A protein has these predicted regions:
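Terminal accessory/targeting
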Residues: 1-86, 93-108
Length: 108
């Protein structure tokens, strides 16, 4: 099962979700189980994206490919520990020029 996580609704959305208890358990160090956390970025500035990628990298999360996700869904393969999916909406040129180097820097 995919767990969408994004910040639609403004910059305070993550804090509001945190206070309301709507964040997936892995955010607090809990087990993901059979869920795959999906981070959806929409029109994300590099200054906002970098700390999120740094957090994931520093805490040993790894990204999965579309083929791996298909294997989890189609074949029932186990989702590895600390696996996350990163999804980027609106393929602006800056995703390639700014986001690409950040993803590479943090091992994604």
């Amino acid at each position: 099962m995919a767990v969408p996580f994004n910040e639609r609704g403004g910059r305070l959305r993550g804090g509001i979700d945190l206070l309301a208890g709507r964040l997936p358990s892995f955010v607090f160090g809990g087990a993901v189980g059979r869920m795959l956390p999906v981070f959806h970025f929409h029109d994300e500035a590099p200054a906002d994206l970098e700390p999120k990628l740094r957090y994931l990298s520093d805490n040993r999360y790894r990204t999965v490919t579309a083929d791996e996700i298909a294997g989890y869904v189609r074949d029932g393969r186990a989702i590895p520990e600390r696996a996350v999916a990163l999804c980027f909406d609106d393929a602006w040129a800056s995703l390639w020029t700014d986001g690409g180097p950040l993803l590479k820097r943090y091992g994604f």
